[in-house]
Amino acid sequence: MKEVLRKVKDASRVTATLNGEIKRKILKEMAEALEQNSSLIINENKKDLKYANENNLSAALIDRLYLDEKRIGSMADALRDIATLKDPVGRVIDGWMLDNGLRIEKVKIPIGVIGIIYESRPNVTSDAAGLCFMSGNACILKGGKEAMYSNIAIINVLRDVLERNSLPKDAVSLLPDYSREGVYKLIQEDKYVDLIIPRGGEKLIKFVSENSKVPVVKHDKGLCHIYIHKDANIDEAVKISVNAKVQRPGVCNAVETLLVDESVKNEILPKLKAEMEKEGVELRGCEKTLEVIDINKATEEDWNTEYLDKILSIKVVRDLNEAIEHIQTYGSGHSDSIITENYSASEEFLNRVDSACVYVNASTRFTDGGEFGFGAEVGISTNKLHARGPMGIDDLTTYKYKIYGNGQIRE
């Protein structure tokens, strides 16, 4: 593994110096190549699907794993979108002149080698490779073994493009070891790897966070909340809540707990129940919720659970303070929303809720790099350092200081 990582590190020194025009050209060629090789990728994907079915993997996981012409086209389009983004490398963030004549510039630079650990979605392979490349980084990717054949096919297509352009193919690499031991070895290699981004289940995140010698930006669970304030537009609150739960229930920005102000519970809960049941959502409520609608009783465990399914917990709260306290206790720092027509209540919620993305009168489903205008994303960070929220190419850079002098010495 050290030899693989050494080559990736060497490649990162080349990618760091590429200008935006070259990077855009390569990304467009990578997009073309994915589409031209779609039959090959689909054939390899069938091997992964066979493994998934033989090992009784969940329907949701198999859906994330599945590739067809349309999905490969979307992967190619994502690379084209990345190619349209402004190159962050070399951008001057700040600059000033000292009294002694030294001119200082704070300039964006690539991080170096980024290790990304993720599970069954092969589209992450091309997205991550594209984002890392556009931001001047090299990447070492560790996908799940259930997507092994698909990932190898995708990476080989991308590497061929680099080679044809006389660039180091190792700038886009797969970790050769798919085992947990392979992950452990990767996260010990702080000599070669500059940042680790784990995307996946709670156990994976915990394992990486506790064992890594390399700095980690976590993409942890999304235990998202919507609080329906006493001054909410009821119809809007129902519409937003249904969207946040059912549009894609298996993703990290779907809502898991609904907090309802006590003063509007009788008006809103029956409407919520009717609309959620139309969508096949199982509701679980606190004692006060059960006084209004007949649903399953929620337990303490429910407030801590990211369902990733058509299940929603409902808690009636006394006021804004209790809603915020609940989010502070059980939230994961991902995305939380308030539905209200009251400006001061919305500002208090925005300022006090300490999550990466805090909304007013909108669905939590918008927490996404594409929706935010970042192009694709490598994930959604629940860290406070080094990046937070959807991570686009800007978040895959750091900075250095360039100091221009004309003979100054320190007295």
From Swiss-Prot:
> What would be one Gene Ontology cellular-component term for the protein?
cytoplasm
Q: Which UniProt keywords apply?
A: Amino-acid biosynthesis, Cytoplasm, NADP, Oxidoreductase, Proline biosynthesis
**EC numbers on record:** 1.2.1.41
One of the protein's GO biological processes: L-proline biosynthetic process
Q: Name one GO molecular function term.
A: NADP binding
**Which CDD domains does the entry mention?**
ALDH_F18-19_ProA-GPR
The gene behind this protein is: proA
Instruction: Provide the family line.
Output: Belongs to the gamma-glutamyl phosphate reductase family.
Protein's cellular compartments: Cytoplasm
Q: In which pathway does it act?
A: Amino-acid biosynthesis; L-proline biosynthesis; L-glutamate 5-semialdehyde from L-glutamate: step 2/2
Q: What does this protein do?
A: Catalyzes the NADPH-dependent reduction of L-glutamate 5-phosphate into L-glutamate 5-semialdehyde and phosphate. The product spontaneously undergoes cyclization to form 1-pyrroline-5-carboxylate.
Reactions catalysed according to its record? L-glutamate 5-semialdehyde + phosphate + NADP(+) = L-glutamyl 5-phosphate + NADPH + H(+)
Protein name (record): Gamma-glutamyl phosphate reductase
Q: Name one Pfam family in it.
A: Aldedh
